[in-house]
């Protein structure tokens, strides 16, 4: 909102406008977030339209990271703009004034299509049946390995991805490679029995074994290859695929690396489905420049397409983009900095569900999977996350 | 489809595969189109899924220009892959074999959401009422001036654009500039009574007069400014808007110019809604590079969002992209080459609806509006379009 020109009629209005303008600036400053005032405005608008609303839902609808939303919400509570009730965040009378008189909000309806949840496509019976099968298999997944930025998409998400590939003509008769597949998108894809060939490269043997068991049981064919993507693809995977699908680590170098391996698989041209986190503009801009420099065009970008299980603090919702490539060229950055934990080391605190003891994960113990409590407990819940400052 | 490796069991299959592969190559070569084999595959897939289907619908679903689709369809008819019935294009038995045995198509359902037609948003009652008003006003539009690439979006399209702006938080309390508005998107936007300020710059006085009449009659405020966008914006429009909306000429220079004028209006940061034609990859890539170089990020891109009236040959459906800008900088190319007619001069043939005489438009007579038949007829129908080769 650009504040320009005449400031209304009376003195009262001038004061209120100035007061709210200063308040907005202060909140943005205190929250210290890349998107500044716009993010604060977005959060207030979403609460105004959907209150009472949970912090997680605010994050989904604003496409802002959950910790940012939580921080802004706390500051807004202190400023008496918001109050927290059992059912979620609500605007106070002051907050309502702020929303209506200053931000000029008045209408509360959401126009997002309820049939498709804004994705633009829906599952028919055939894909619904596939989803039901995927749900069963997804329960057998191992625990996430956060050191390699694992974070599992919901079975619904992976099935919608397969449906989107079908709808756009990128599934029937096509050779498809999954560049990393902790999301198990190869499962619904294989269950369609539409692809000419499906292959998965992943560094995590646990994921590959699950996919192999699945293939055996369901009578489908998925080639699995254990491979560290920091190294070039094996020769027999090169230049033989029509389509690749990836949900890489959410760093610029992670994106460049995974897409480059995808390009090795595609050769000079092909289609890439990229799932990626909503990012602050500066980072977003480097990412889009990297994408176009590799020779990919963004032919479609659907926000809030992907939802994830478990670690909702890290990734609650991301977009999917369909990239069309011609004269593709690989572009690999610093392969040592691809995981977010390496860029910004993170300590996670887990609570033992048996005795309640708090454990640190991220220094000596690297993965929650390696954690065993002194009481013998093996189930934990993440309660806090902390970024370590880089030296 | 990459054709690799083993070619099946028997001799018959080898021959068929080879035959169809040669056929696909030949059709793509004869059609001489930028997207090559993929475009031909896309056309066959859309016919397979939706037959019988009109050429216009094929163009919409494949996002290919109508003349290209018509050309490929004619070649496919000659090759006995397609037949034309009263109800549209259908595959022959040979075509079905081609689709099922070679392209490996088998499933025919469309997963595009029928509620929102793939747009991801729907109009509620409030916006439906607005649409009904816009429909009435749209009937009063002048004839399109094709020398400045006019082509009117449907009232539904312009109302959906306003709805999208609302849904994304870019309407309430915002200052919005329409950089060119032959689509009359300012009308539904103003009817919401949500914006802080609405302004329109356009070179066509007829459009501005209609908007002025509308504002007077409907009691809304839209500032209209007659302006040739090849010149910088008037000083009092600079750096005062939060959001711009544009559907520029579909040339790289047209896009750069219109977005740059938008940046003058926004200042360092802001939101842009860009409607633009689905283009062949090479051109698309220059366009996306131009967008990111100006400092805009594509935060969302919805294909087939916009539909146009009348000149369906030129533009049947285009996408809308929501761009978010930070540290924006203008980037103006060759302002003399912004209109497609100047890049590739086009002759249009119009038939008088009274006497049937055919008239040429594009050389001496520049606009269909200037055309009067010797019989006195003033209503014409475009029947053919021809590109002149540039010297």
From Swiss-Prot, chains A, B:
Pfam families: BpsA_C. One of its GO terms (molecular function) is transferase activity. InterPro entries: BpsA (IPR014435), BpsA_C (IPR002723), rRNA_MeTrfase/Polyamine_Synth (IPR051720), SAM-dependent_MTases_sf (IPR029063), WH-like_DNA-bd_sf (IPR036388), WH_DNA-bd_sf (IPR036390). One of its GO terms (biological process) is polyamine biosynthetic process. Transmembrane segments: none annotated. PANTHER family: RRNA N6-ADENOSINE-METHYLTRANSFERASE METTL5. This is Uncharacterized protein MJ0675. The lineage of its organism: Archaea, Methanobacteriati, Methanobacteriota, Methanomada group, Methanococci.
